């Protein structure tokens, strides 16, 4: 994750936003695939998940929140793992927990929630391909195992299934709003980077 990079509000971050969130006086950020954000000031962070996984982290007493959007289960054997840790579920969890630890926040003081991991193939291919490649299921499995390794049990989960999700994460309160996507709405393409929004 990079040092404080200020993200700008864009149309993707507010599209499909629940009405009760429109009036909040917060920065609106869009989290792309392979990115992670740690926000020391409250922000409303939106992302769209298919088979990808997001984990939200919230520290209630400091109102610090973090989230990542990972597309692959493990960094093991990945040539770009050091450059793009938030692309991989296991490395993203370790990276965000490391960022909290550098601020004196222990893993067991965080409220953690797990999202995503859908199997979004078309119905005709689902049965034939699920046993071969279920990246979403594997992403969820690795997320749970990695969190467990740090002694963390997710407070809530909205995972698996056959539809993508749009998430809105309030980093100051830890609240997450989820909207299931219609099967015709693909996740949005994006760059593979990590960012750290600390100020």
UniProtKB/Swiss-Prot annotation:
Signal peptide: none
Top EC group: hydrolase
Catalytic reaction equation(s): L-glutaminyl-[protein] + H2O = L-glutamyl-[protein] + NH4(+)
Domain of life: Bacteria
GO biological process, one term: chemotaxis
Enzyme Commission number, as recorded: 3.5.1.44
Any one GO MF annotation of this record: protein-glutamine glutaminase activity
InterPro entries: CheD-like_sf (IPR038592), Chemorcpt_Glu_NH3ase_CheD (IPR005659), Cytotoxic_necrot_fac-like_cat (IPR011324)
Keywords from the named record: Chemotaxis, Hydrolase
Pfam families with a match to the protein in the record: CheD
Family indicated by similarity: Belongs to the CheD family.
PANTHER family: CHEMORECEPTOR GLUTAMINE DEAMIDASE CHED-RELATED
Chain's role: Probably deamidates glutamine residues to glutamate on methyl-accepting chemotaxis receptors (MCPs), playing an important role in chemotaxis.
Name this protein carries in UniProt: Probable chemoreceptor glutamine deamidase CheD
The organism of origin for this protein: Nitratidesulfovibrio vulgaris (strain ATCC 29579 / DSM 644 / CCUG 34227 / NCIMB 8303 / VKM B-1760 / Hildenborough)
Lineage, uppermost ranks: Bacteria, Pseudomonadati, Thermodesulfobacteriota, Desulfovibrionia, Desulfovibrionales
